[in-house]
């Protein structure tokens, strides 16, 4: 599985209830960690919480819902963003659970990146000429894989001890 919408909802619920928890995850979680093929709602809510937190604004469910509505996105099943955000605030979220949930969510994001890398490698392998050297073939695959995956090892936003 490459996404978990329940984890996304749990993280958003935690941030709505405890916006100070954003500081714990801001160095390794961003909007791209939210699966948005079905609906951009969760990533949009996260981005608005992120903007409010970074701007020193209060994170209030009414204000967040208003800002989501102002974005003007259409959501599947005619979902009302205000009702959805209200449902998030009603979720039970254990105290101090934001960091743990964010680390679990990051695992899904990494899986999606690995999947995308493998798809890009497959495309590249199909386009390499038959007379290409072994070295060229391997280096082509390596460059695609490493350009995405090394981010998690070496990048400034790499989470610490994600698998603990």
Where are these regions (language model features)?
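Noncatalytic partner-interaction/assembly domains of nucleic-acid and motor enzyme complexes
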Residues: 1-108
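Sparse recognition of residues in long alpha-helices and their boundaries
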Residues: 27, 61, 117-118, 130, ...
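A sequence-level detector of short, solvent-exposed, charge-rich linear segments
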Residues: 30, 64, 68, 120-124, ...
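Generic detector of ordered secondary-structure context
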Residues: 3, 93, 106, 133, ...
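The Walker A/P-loop phosphate-binding site
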Residues: 13, 154-164
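Non-catalytic interaction/clamp surfaces of large macromolecular machines
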Residues: 114-119, 123-153
